[in-house]
Every structure is written in structure tokens, then in C-alpha cells.
UniProtKB/Swiss-Prot annotation:
Protein known as: Chemocyanin
Cross-referenced Gene3D superfamilies: Cupredoxins - blue copper proteins (2.60.40.420)
Signal peptide segment: 1-30
Keywords assigned by UniProt, alphabetized: Copper, Disulfide bond, Metal-binding, Signal
Length: 126
């Protein structure tokens, strides 16, 4: 009987530990952000990331008229010069979902004059 009692105690301790873990573990969930909020991806959104905390795995949704704009993921140099290099990923659906990588993620509109007019954002994800 003593042996059965030890098994019950171990099961109880294991149950308590599992309950503790369930209630004290932090679950990392990605957050979905719509770039530009209600206005979408358009001129004047370059300051949109300010004050927000982004994490790797969060998703940016770019909503825009695909007949007018696009979204291009570029490196820092392309962001500064408003140039999409060959091999840059171009999105043009008007409802694009892009998952953030750790570090700074740069996006521009490659329609002539749009990036130069301020249609670009830099988003840093921890």
C-alpha cells in the first residue's frame, strides 16, 4: 500500500506543477496591425509606427488601392534612396499581410514619386 500512496503523491505534485505552469507561462501571440489604421497605406503614414511596440512574428496588413500603390520590402539603403533593388519582394494585392522579422523592417511604395512623397515606413521589431 505504501507504494501506491507514493504514486498518488507524485501524480498530485505533477498536477500542481502543471496547473502552476499553465497559469504562469507567458504565451507569445503575434499581433496584427493595419498600417495607417483606418486610412490604410497612403501618403502620411510614415509616422504611423511611432509609439507602437512591435515583435518579430507580428503581422502588418497593408490595405490600399492596387491600381494606385504597392508595397515593397527593401533593405535600409533602398528605404533611404527610395529604390527597390532587383530581388526586392513586391506586394500588389491591396490587402497584403507581411510578418515582421526581428530588427528593422523597411517598406516603400515603388510607384514613381510615392516614396519620395513620404509613402514609406520603417518598423523595428524586438
Amino acid at each position: 500500500m505504501a507504494q501506491g500512496s507514493g504514486s498518488a503523491e507524485r501524480a498530485l505534485v505533477l498536477g500542481v506543477v502543471l496547473v502552476f505552469l499553465v497559469f504562469n507561462c507567458e504565451v507569445a501571440e503575434s499581433v496584427v496591425y493595419t498600417v495607417g489604421d483606418g486610412g490604410g497605406w497612403t501618403f502620411g503614414t510614415s509616422g504611423w509606427p511611432a509609439g507602437k511596440t512591435f515583435r518579430a512574428g507580428d503581422v502588418l496588413v497593408f490595405k490600399y488601392n492596387p491600381a494606385v500603390h504597392n508595397v515593397v520590402s527593401v533593405p535600409a539603403g533602398g528605404y533611404k534612396s527610395c529604390t527597390a533593388s532587383p530581388g526586392s519582394r513586391v506586394f500588389k494585392s491591396g490587402d497584403d499581410r507581411i510578418t515582421l522579422s526581428r530588427g528593422t523592417n523597411y517598406f516603400i511604395c515603388s510607384v514613381p514619386g510615392h516614396c519620395q512623397g513620404g509613402l514609406k515606413i520603417a518598423v523595428t521589431a524586438a
